[in-house]
Amino acid sequence: MKIKITYFALLFLVFYGCNKDTTVPIPMAGPNSILGDTYPLTSSAKLLMDGVYKVNDGSGLFGSQVILKWNRTHLSIACNNGKYFVMDVGRLDSVIFLQGYWRDGYSDGTGLASMHIARGEGGTMIVSGTGQQTIVIRGAYGQGSTLPDQVLNLTRLRSFSTKAAASKFYILAHRSGGRTSDRLPVSENSLAMIGFTERLGSTGIEVDVRITKDGIPFLYHDGDLNIRLTEKGPLAGPAENYTWAQLSAFVRLIHGEKIPTLEEALTYTIDSTLLNFVYLDMKETSGAMATVTSIQERMLQHAAAKGRDIIIVVGIPTTGALNDLKSVPGYQSIPSLCELTVDDVRAVNSMVWAPRWTLGLQNDLVQQMHDEGRLALCWTIDQPNWIEEYITQGHFNGLLTNFPYVVAYYHYTQQ
Amino acid sequence: MKPLFTPGSIPKSLLPMFIFLVVTGTSVAQKADAADTFDITAPSMRFPHQYRQWGFQVAAGLLMVKPPMDLLENAIQAPLVNIHMTFGLPWRLSLEGDVQTIVVSNQFSLGPRIGYGYRNFYFNAGWDVAWVYGQLRQIGFDNRAKVWLHYPNLSVGYKLKRMAFTLRGEAVFVAKLTETSGGNEVSVSRNFYNGFTVGFYLEQRLWKNHVFIFGLKDNYEKYYWPTWMLFTTFNRYYHIPELSFMWIL
């Protein structure tokens, strides 16, 4: 009998113990990277590198064409198949060195990448800002933790088109910039993710807002505290059951970060990033609209004082949230994003209409919104073929996605 | 923004009850009468023996699945209902059918087996073709999925008088996968290797001719059909454990 009990107990343990998800490690160039001896590029030099590039060698993995786009901290390369590069860049004299990693956002593929731009192949032009050279980037990439040993060569084809460069198109990343399930090095809905997401091509973020037992709005997606999003700890059940002091003291996100309050997150976004759109996705926060909108108003004033051109909208995903907003005095002047019908948008004078992408392009309704001075976004679109169609055939002002680098690719390659 | 249904486990509080049932049932079964002529071969269903010609047998039960946390998020959990059928044919052949459902996602499979035995060891090989149909038209969604799959499979088994052990492996190929949302084709994929599964099954007499099947299966797959409504774009293999409790009717 004991043997049988042990037998079934072991099976039980196997069943519940074999589902360990992983994080994809970021390959590092190591302490001997040449970048330690280089100098940073100027802003004008960085702009000269932005553009559409042809992949001469390496197209089997990265496609035949990529875009290079500088963000606040890094040079990002986006492919049309969900792969992207995050590169550190520096110069020595007129030679430009790029070192970093590539990652496949749809799977766990990753590897080191090391490239350079020689003096005569665009380096001099980039550093001096004069002359006409076609930029050629030569280098190699690796797979996993191996050293880069496979050839990767890129040739600049053109600058971004006026349509792509001049239009204010919002590339909104889900969960403050990326999901934990995307196996990024930082946790979703954390300050670290807000600081990280620009490397993925994001220009704005969606964050999930909940309210503590003592009325403090904070960022967290799931309905309960769980090991998908947090480290094992003493608290369990709905996060809203706890006070902010309890959450702050006892809960750490899956990569060790603290859960941020909404105010911390918005302050960080305004002060420390170039993100220009924040969508506050209200998660079961019945009756808390006044609290959230007062923080929103204060943060918009803070942004204005800093000279930051940023949109912060409170989300209206349900009729319950719509009614909550209507209960706030002066609700028609509160910047909001309504996921419901265009009539609901008009009823609360939302700044943004955001239908689910599966409802179609709806170009006529989008145009109506534009004519009324509103923006139109759609959510949450992840398949490359649909991202391409919505960018090339649609009139939306932006897309909410889990794969901002794919949206960036299709947006910046528009002719 | 993703209020979706996925399969999951029944409440964990029920698991000890199942385990208790199996353990106590096993204990009772071992006290069977010495004159008892019971042979597990005849009523077993997962065991790869040659099924009796023109015989038909049905088992029904529940599958409890633990989808990976990458996919699960806030999904509502429900066990899958499973009905398994065997129909004996001449020349060591049999036909096996299987229905699995969580209402919004359903798989129907059918395939032949050919089996051999040597003393207490048995072996069979088969090929199942499955069709999945899923539909979710609640809470503002209008999503559908249709999938054709192939499951070439091998089983080996060893039997005692009242107990049979079966190890079964199958490869999983997706022939065609079509998912639509709001009338838009979200994805169409064809002809890809999707992974494999390895399952262990214990068939145990509880009393008289009543047999219980306990199964533990690891689905190592990229696309796990019951989770179609998540429209995942991940191109990763996941270990998806599946616990089954079935009763041969």
Give the location of each predicted region:
Chain A
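Sec-dependent signal peptide recognition
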Residues: 2-10
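C-terminal motif of bacterial Sec signal peptides marking the signal peptidase cleavage site
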Residues: 14-17
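Phosphate-group recognition and catalysis centered on beta-loop-alpha active-site segments
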Residues: 19-415
